[in-house]
Every structure is written in structure tokens, then in C-alpha cells.
Amino acid sequence: MKRKSRILIGTAIVVVALLVALFLARKQFVGGPGSPTVEGSRAVTDGGIKIPGWNGRVDAAEERAGMTLDAARLVQEGQALHVTTGPATSYWKTDAIASGDFTVKATFTEPKYMNLNSHPHPYGVFIGGNDMGTPNQTELYCAASGNGKFIVRGFGPKPFSMTGLLSESNAAIHKAAGRGQPVTQDISLAVRGDKVVCSINGSSVASYDKTTLVGPGKLTSTNGYYGLRFAHNTDVFVSLLASSTK
């Protein structure tokens, strides 16, 4: 009996030692260029926001894993914005505010589908941004990936999903011909009266009553900042970001 107890105690000590070693190794390397986080994010080199007037925030889970805005990159290249993540990040301009009835849209081009990840990662636009840059930040985003699927999710400030746990397929969403091939999506979010509609490549893919999006645990309002949303480990060019009352 004593021998069995000693074996159990010894095994427990070994397990605890391994867990401590793994924790310390993770703590040492998380956040540096090329390092992983709990969600598999890999920090980019020469990161940060390189365009005046732009702001950003990485997801709370990424922050807890040691990631910062310097682990992702936003730069201007010609007429397009070039975003490389890194941690899952939201970007917005200081003066990008929309209220009432409006449409926010942008064109996203992934020049080499899945070149930074092992599975499709989405990108898109967000609206309803409030308390920006703080732990209470709220937003609703519609994002697509190059496998013909999309998600509608948000922060209130904790994450919430309007499309369930998994992404949804829709024939309107473009599919890349293969890994490393280009794919482009036109993505918009529109507020019209009591409805909020996500459209991709000119077709409505999701529509919600505003009352299901605003309230405790969700948006403060559909009014607020608008901007761009990227999952972790993406490499995307963005053009024609705009808000209109049409």
C-alpha cells in the first residue's frame, strides 16, 4: 500500500513539474516575432500601425496571451491598405463614425489564400464600435473567408456569435482556386431602420432585427465607429473602405 502511494505521489510530482515547465516555456516565448499564442497566432516582424489617424485593438484573449498591436501590421501600399496578422485585430480611423441608416463596405483581396495559416481565416468590416480601445469595446462584424463561408460575430464586450459556433456557407462568397491562389470579397454591413444586413459580393447573406444585436452582452448601439476586422494569421489587402447613407 505504501509502495503504491509513493508511486502515485511520484507520478503527481512529475506531472506538476511538466506543467510548470510548459507554462514557463510558453510565458518566455509568447509575443515575439513568429511566436504562437493559445489560439495559434504568430506575431509578425516590423509590426504596428504605420498609417497616421488609424487605431486598433487586439482581442482580449490575444492580450492575455501576451500579444499587442505590434504583433500585427497595418500599412499603406499604393491605394490599398495591407494588413498582416498576427493576433486577431480590429482597426478603425479616428473619424470613422456612422449613425442612423448607413452602409459600410470594403473590398478584401487575399493574394495568396491561406499563406499564413493551415485553415481558412476570415476578414471583414465592423460597425457599432463603442468604448474603442478599452476592455469594454463593442462591435459587430461580418467576415468572409476564401472557402465560401462567412461569420457574423461581435463583442459586447465578451464575444458573441450570430451564426452559431461554426461559419456558414453561401454561394455568393468567392472561393479561392486553391491554397496560394488569390481571392477577393466585397463585404458590407448596412443598417436600415430596424434591420442590420450583411452582404457579400452584392448578395445579402444574413439579416437581423436590430433588437437582437443591441442590449446586455451585445452592442451598446449600431451607431459608432466602423472599421476592419481580421482573424489571426491573415495577409490581406483592403481597398474602397467607405461609409454612405445609400
What name fits each language-model region?
Residues 106, 179-213:
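Carbohydrate-binding surfaces in secreted/extracellular proteins
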Residues 32-69:
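Extracellular carbohydrate-recognition regions
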Residues 159-186:
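Short, aromatic/His-centered strand-loop micro-motif at the edge of beta-sheets
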Residues 70-90:
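Short carbohydrate-recognition loop motifs
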Residues 208-236:
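Flexible glycan-contacting loops in extracellular carbohydrate-active proteins
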Residues 21-33:
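Hydrophobic single-pass membrane-insertion segments
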Residues 84-161:
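Secretory/extracellular carbohydrate-interaction modules
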Residues 2-15:
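N-terminal Sec-pathway targeting helices
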